[in-house]
Structures are given as structure tokens and as C-alpha cells.
Amino acid sequence: MISVVIPTYKEPVALDLCLKSAIEGQYNKNQIIVVVDGFYDLNKEVLEKYKNNIDVLNIEENVGMIRAMNLGHYNASNNLVFHVQDDNVFPKDWDINLESSYKPNSVVTANQIEPTPSMFKQFIIQNLGRDVKTFDIKGFWDFEKSIAKNTVDECGSTFPFLIGKSDYLKVGGFDENYPGPWVVDWEFFMKCKLSGLKMLRTYKSNFYHFVSLGTRTPEKVEENKIKEQNCFEYFAYKWGSYPKHNPHNNEKSL
């Protein structure tokens, strides 16, 4: 069995689709932890809808995605923990396909399908919809089944990922000192690699990712650019150099 950690903030419609696909798409009954990062009332209707199939961790004040992920992980009851975002859609049989791809001392990334070109060469680019409200989940499941391959390679290091509960803790989880949710994932995957974990990717399970939800004003975009740069600066302060990304296998290094 797997414990799933889904942090959520202000996207109840996306969360609804995410949970529907996770619950209806699973082969076994897994633990699904929804970490509500503030704004419980905004998400209350969706949480009530799936209350018999999820565990809710309600953080009354917004603490940010990094802290929310760590708290969700600490509350996992199974030895394998799957970290996923609320703007993902789960494929059919995601749980048994992930478990069959997992090996001890590894981190298994599920491949993704995205509607627009990506920096990650392994992703499948197919526009199956940009609107969560009108998304055809059955059409996605049929498409995903047609392109899924029983293949695993060492090109992991992206979300969503499956990891042993203790392995996550051994590398210190996600560093909560980062000034935002950028770069911290690069550091996490780098720490996993440095600790001897194999960074795998399975093509047996392909999750849909909406990429960017919500309206972003030019001011917000500029603000995020500054925060992202601050995250790079924090990494350099901590490690003595800026992070490097290998575009061929997604490996993160100094």
C-alpha cells in the first residue's frame, strides 16, 4: 500500500478532479492525505465529498508548500509515500504500476503528460485539456493506457515521485528555510542522489499535469521571478555554488 501526500491551497476544482482520479483509479485502497495549507473553508465542500476515502491534515494558517509536504510525509502510515500536486490527474491503476516499478534504495518518478512543451525531454506533450472543469477523465485514461510502456530508466528527479518513508527522512525532506517553492525540489533530488538512491522514472504510469492554474498578474509574475532568484541565491549560500541541471537525465548537481 502507498500513502499519497497532496498539498492543496486555493484550487478546490483542481483538487476535486485530482481526488476523483486518485480514488477511482486506484487498484487497492491506499492512504490519501490531503494537506490543507490554510483556506479550509474554501476546500471544505470537496473534502466532505471524499471524506470516506481521504485523511485531512488541516493547517489553519498558510505555511507554504514545502512545510505542507513535510507535514504530510510525517503523517504517512505506509512505508512508501507518493508526493503529488493537486493539479495532477491520476491514471488508472497508478498504485500497482508505481509499486511494481519501485526497488529498494530508489526514488521513482511517474512520467507526466503536459499540454505545452516542457524542459523535461521525457514528458509526453499532448493537449488533453487546459480547463479543469471540462476535463475528460475517461479520454485521458484511454489515452494514457495507449501510450504506457513497461519501461524504467534513470531519468527521474521530477514530480510526482514515490519514495520510502525513511529515505525521505534520512535526506532531511525538503528544506523549509527556502524563501519559496523554487529550487528546493532540485536540492531534494540532489540530496537523494548524493545519499546513494537511484533516481528512476517509470513510463508505466503517466500523470496529466495542468502546469499552471489560476490568473497571474504581471506584478505577480515579476514577484515570483524575484522569489525564484532568491531561492537560487539561498542554494548557492548553502552549497557554495549554484545548482546544475542535466537536461538528458534530469540529474541535479553542484
Predicted regions, residues:
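A short, conserved alpha-helix in the catalytic core of glycosyltransferases
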Residues: G156, P160-F161, D167, V171, ...
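Glycine-rich, basic loop-to-helix element that forms the pyrophosphate-binding segment
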Residues: I59-A76
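Active-site donor/metal-binding and catalytic loop motifs
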Residues: P179, R201-K220
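Short, acidic, metal-binding catalytic loop of nucleotide-sugar glycosyltransferases
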Residues: S21-K29
